UniProtKB/Swiss-Prot annotation:
This is Uncharacterized protein CXorf66. Keywords: Glycoprotein, Membrane, Signal, Transmembrane, Transmembrane helix. Residues 99-184, 209-247, 295-316 are annotated as: Disordered. It is a single-pass type I membrane protein. Residues 1-19 form the signal peptide.
């Protein structure tokens, strides 16, 4: 820019010198007043041009300086903002880390953790094994340690204590629910095994082992007796499918019950077994007849030997004789009394069963 200005100034100075020389030569030849007016006008024009050029150059220079200064100021302000943001981020990080260390080192977190452990232990009081009792004895002794090594151990942990506490709480809740389910299953199995032990004590023949499912009861449970099928010693000796070591203590206690308690609990089963045992062959034959004819017939397992029962049965036979076919009757010869014949007739239309006892002469 300075070079351009110098060149313009030199050109203007040369023109001025040339004009002065021409004016000196012409003054000697022509009229003086006319030449003097023309020279003055030319001189003014040149001076005006020089002033306009100088003004333009100064304006351009000022604009350039202004733009350059604005750009530098914008860059400086941006750099200052970035520095301020970096300083604020560093200060926030340091304050957050200090707060974490203070919260970890504070002794208030120790009783909170101990209360959480105690609540999780109290939420599962149904544990009935030796291992759980030993763990409960060990836990309070471990909680009585000083808080200084605990705080030092917490400082070595990663910077995400909240997530670990949430995961530990979820694990404890899942363990407690699992233990409650296992205790319920163990109580059901205990009841089934008590029934099975009572049946074994009351009967001479092997009995079906207990199963954990609800039996399907019919609409007339009093008139229905299902014969028990014998099982071999191999099937009785099979262990359960799902073995749980936590139930071993409860099952051992159930197995160590005294004979007197078993006898007291098995009295109703003995009565039922005696009734079913006296009429077992009769019930087996009735079940075969039911399979041949229909499955919805209800069979009575007792036959009265009094004269009134004979009269009632004769009247029923006379009343329902029209509805009975030859295929609906069945004869049973008992092993004890060879002179007695038991005839059982099944009525399909009325869903009733009548029986007769006649003597062979």
């Amino acid at each position: 820019m300075n070079l351009v200005i110098c060149v313009l100034l030199l050109s203007i100075w040369k023109n001025n010198c040339m004009t002065t020389n021409q004016t000196n030569g012409s003054s000697t030849t022509g009229d003086k007043p006319v030449e003097s007016m023309q020279t003055k006008l030319n001189y003014l024009r040149r001076n005006l041009l020089i002033l306009v050029g100088i003004i333009i150059m100064v304006f351009v220079f000022i604009c350039f300086c202004y733009l350059h200064y604005n750009c530098l100021s914008d860059d400086a302000s941006k750099a200052g903002m970035v520095k301020k943001k970096g300083i604020a981020a560093k200060s926030s990080k340091t304050s957050f880390s200090e707060a974490k260390t203070a919260s970890q080192c504070s002794p208030e977190t120790q009783p909170m953790l101990s209360t959480a452990d105690k609540s999780s232990d109290s939420s599962s009081p149904e544990r009935a094994s030796a291992q759980s009792s030993t763990e409960k004895l060990i836990r309070p002794s471990s909680l009585q340690k000083p808080s200084i090594p605990n705080s030092a151990g917490k400082l070595t942990r990663p910077s995400y204590p909240k997530r670990s506490s949430k995961s530990s709480c979820s694990k404890k809740l899942s363990k407690s629910s699992h233990l409650e389910k296992a205790h319920k299953k163990g109580s059901l199995e205990k009841l089934c095994k008590l029934d099975y032990a009572c049946k074994l004590a009351s009967s001479d023949k092997p009995v079906r082992p207990p199963q954990l499912f609800k039996p399907l009861y019919s609409s007339h449970p009093q008139n229905e007796i299902s014969p028990s099928k014998p099982f071999g010693p191999q099937e009785l000796a099979k262990p359960p499918k799902h073995f749980n070591p936590k139930r071993s203590v409860s099952l051992g206690r159930a197995a160590l019950l005294s004979n007197s308690e078993l006898a007291e609990t098995c009295q109703p089963y003995k009565k039922k077994h005696l009734v079913a045992k006296t009429y077992r062959p009769l019930v087996n034959d009735i079940s075969e007849a039911k399979e041949k004819n229909t499955q919805n017939l209800h069979v009575s397992s007792k036959v009265k030997s009094s004269s009134r029962s004979f009269r009632k049965l004769d009247s029923r036979n006379n009343a329902y004789g029209d509805h009975v076919n030859d295929s609906d009757t069945m004869k049973y010869y008992s092993e004890v009394d060879s002179d007695k014949v038991i005839i059982i007739t099944c009525d399909r239309g009325y869903n009733q069963v009548t029986s007769e006892v006649t003597l062979n002469d």
